[in-house]
C-alpha cells in the first residue's frame, strides 16, 4: 500500500499498488488524466473533430474580419479568447454526444476549467503590463519579463479558483486542482502573450502554433469524464 498519490510517486510503487488495489488505480487515473475511466475511441474522435471544427470556425471568422490568412491573424486578447472558446466549445460539444448525464457534467466542467485557464492568465498579464508601462522602474525588458511570469502564474491560480466556483458554487465536490500537465499545457498562455507582443518574429511563431494548442485544450475537455 502506498501513501497519497502525487507527481512524485514512483511508477513501480503505483504499478505494485494497482495490482492489489483497483481503487487506488482509479484514483491515480482520475488525478493524472481527470477521468474516472478509460476514454472510448468514439469519444476521442468526437472530441477531436469537435475541437478542430470549433477552432477552424473561429480562425476563419477572425481571418475574414482582418482580411488575412487564418494562420497570420494579428492576435489581441479578444482573438485569444475567441479561438480558445471555439476550440473548447467544439471539443465539449463533440464529447457529449451519446454521453451519460454524469460524463456530460464532467466534460462541461473541464471545458470551463480549460477556457478559464486559456483566457484569464493572458488577461491578467495584459492588465499588469498596462499598469507597469506607466512606471519607469518596471517599463524595461527585465520588468516586462517579470510582469509576464507573475501574470501567468497568478492568472493560472485565479483561473482554477474561478472555474471551480462556476462549476461547483456550492462546493459539494473536490476542487479541480492544477497539475503539472496543466502547467505544461499553459504554454498556450505564454504563446498567447507573445502573440500580443510588439515583436513580429514572436508573432510569427505564435500565429500558427496557438490554434493547435487550443484545439488540444478542446480535445482534453471533450474526452474528460
Task: Tell what function each PLM region has.
Residues 1-225:
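Glycine-rich, hydrophobic membrane-spanning regions of integral membrane proteins that mediate transport
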Amino acid at each position: 500500500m502506498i501513501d497519497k498519490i502525487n507527481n512524485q510517486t514512483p511508477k513501480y510503487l503505483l504499478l505494485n499498488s494497482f495490482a492489489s488495489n483497483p481503487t487506488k488505480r482509479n484514483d491515480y487515473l482520475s488525478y493524472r488524466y481527470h477521468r474516472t475511466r478509460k476514454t472510448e475511441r468514439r469519444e476521442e474522435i468526437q472530441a477531436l473533430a469537435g475541437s478542430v471544427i470549433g477552432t477552424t470556425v473561429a480562425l476563419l471568422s477572425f481571418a475574414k474580419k482582418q482580411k488575412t490568412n487564418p494562420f497570420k491573424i494579428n492576435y489581441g486578447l479578444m482573438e485569444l479568447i475567441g479561438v480558445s472558446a471555439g476550440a473548447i466549445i467544439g471539443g465539449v460539444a463533440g464529447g457529449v454526444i451519446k454521453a451519460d448525464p454524469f460524463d456530460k457534467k464532467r466534460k462541461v466542467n473541464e471545458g470551463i476549467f480549460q477556457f478559464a485557464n486559456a483566457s484569464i492568465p493572458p488577461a491578467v498579464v495584459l492588465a499588469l503590463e498596462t499598469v507597469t508601462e506607466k512606471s519607469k522602474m518596471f517599463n524595461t525588458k527585465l520588468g516586462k519579463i517579470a510582469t509576464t511570469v507573475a501574470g501567468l502564474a497568478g492568472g493560472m491560480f485565479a483561473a482554477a479558483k474561478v472555474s471551480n466556483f462556476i462549476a461547483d458554487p456550492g462546493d459539494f465536490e473536490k476542487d479541480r486542482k492544477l497539475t503539472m500537465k496543466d502547467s505544461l499545457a499553459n504554454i498556450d498562455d505564454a504563446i498567447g502573450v507573445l502573440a500580443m507582443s510588439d515583436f513580429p518574429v514572436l508573432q510569427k511563431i505564435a500565429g500558427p502554433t496557438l490554434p493547435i494548442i487550443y484545439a488540444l485544450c478542446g480535445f482534453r475537455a471533450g474526452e474528460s469524464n
